[in-house]
Amino acid sequence: MTDRHILTPAEGISSDGYITDQDCFSSVRYRGMRADINGCGWIAAYNLRHALGQEADWDEVRQEMDAMHTLRFPGPTLMRIMRSYLAKYVPDYRETAGREEAAQAAKESFAGIFRYQEGHEPHFISFVRQPDGRFRFFNVTDGLEDCVMPMSRFQEEHLIRGHVIALTVSEDGADREESSRGTT
């Protein structure tokens, strides 16, 4: 029998404060489940606030979003909860639906969140523009926990099935938030 290393939340956070690996949150509960299974929504919301330079504690974000779900049964973050949470903390965000439209809005943004299907699973991820024009993506999938690529490549490789929604913040909105650009 071999000892299996249990991942901890600290291991899932980058040196510049982004949550990069949802798998490290198996000891944390969200909506009655282990957050490594259904935590992508609150993780994306935390990362977006972090990208905008807002003071946010990941556990407080998780607890607040969990409490916003009035129906107390296990499941993922609902879009209405994500919208309500962002309206409170990121009031200048813009929602765009449709694969091409969402990708274009994201390409023109400073930072944001995608709601899409990764494989066959609904998923939220966050992203932030880098100084060279590419984007840094967080918590995409195993092997792509923290990666930098052009938005067009992300679109070609990940926004390929199902409904896509982009929740984006423009450069102007980011400037008002006293942005920290989160470079690698």
Per-segment meaning from a language model:
Residues 1-71:
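Active-site-adjacent structural segments surrounding the nucleophilic cysteine of cysteine proteases
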Residues 6, 10, 23, 75-77, ...:
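Generic low-complexity segments that are intrinsically disordered, proline-rich and/or Lys/Arg-biased
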Residues 12, 23-24, 96, 101-102, ...:
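Intrinsic disorder/low-complexity segments enriched in polar/small residues
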Residues 47, 118-119, 142-145:
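Solvent-exposed loop/turn segments at secondary-structure junctions
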Residues 60-101, 108-109, 116:
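Papain-like cysteine protease catalytic cores
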Residues 94-136:
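Active-site-adjacent substructure of cysteine-protease-like catalytic cores
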Residues 128-184:
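Noncatalytic regulatory segments and standalone regulatory/sensor domains
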